[in-house]
Amino acid sequence: MGNKVIAMKSGRFIGVMSGTSLDGIDVVLAAIDERMVAQQASYCHPMPLQLKKDILGMCQGQSTTLSAVGKLESQLGILFAEAVLALLAKAGLTAQDITAIGCHGQTVWHEPLGEPAFTMQLGDNNRIAAMTKIATVGDFRRRDMAYGGQGAPLVPAFHHALLAHSTERRMVLNIGGIANLSMLLPDLPVRGFDTGPGNMLMDAWIWRNRSLPYDKDNEMDAPTFTASECLNVSVKTQKKERPHESIYSWYRLGKKCFPASWCRLQRSNCS
């Protein structure tokens, strides 16, 4: 991501996000006044188990049909709208109180190294707008790619708006399903890129081996290896498997870059 950051419009906005962890639909109500952002309410809407399985199957490249893709697009649009309506009820507000909804959509495929590069998010924004009666914007990733970005414009832009400094060099690490880094350097455009898997692989391992959605409060026994040791092994493995690629090209990542088989390999290497 390297596009110019523009000033934010004042008003109340709702953000809708469903990441690669698939642990729920996060919705946040924020009042924005130029560079000031005040969170006013938040809510996590549950993700139905069957829908989660359908999304995971698509992300892992299982065979599908156009009918299944279209159905999932509509189902997610309805689910996102229901999450927004639940947040409004919790906050005691109506559609007239909200300037706009920003909906990222659910990523099912992300291929920034493709020729041409592309990314795909599902979740019908038209359905969200119709059900909530609120203007809805989205499709952020594809626009970023069209301008030469890696398809992840939102987090770096947000970090820049809130944390950029006129003289200090700052970097912000955001750990989601895939971890990413924002570089905030004085007098230079904001830059952002992926650094590798975040909680996505941990969640996948816990689900596969303990039938739990995630490791709540780190209740599982502590590992016998350190994070740095495992990282070193992972980098060495990647260099061996992809000798002709620069390590910097690994920054442009998607969930398909780290399937369950990759997770098992890294765990066995670190044991």
Swiss-Prot record:
Disulphide bond pairs: none
Gene3D superfamilies: 3.30.420.40
InterPro entries documented for this protein: Anhydro_N_Ac-Mur_kinase (IPR005338), ATPase_NBD (IPR043129)
One GO term (biological process): peptidoglycan turnover
Coiled coil: none
Source taxon at top rank: Bacteria
Matches recorded under Pfam families: AnmK (PF03702)
Molecular-function annotations in GO: ATP binding; phosphotransferase activity, alcohol group as acceptor
Family listed: Belongs to the anhydro-N-acetylmuramic acid kinase family.
Protein name in the entry: Uncharacterized anhydro-N-acetylmuramic acid kinase-like protein
Organism: Yersinia enterocolitica
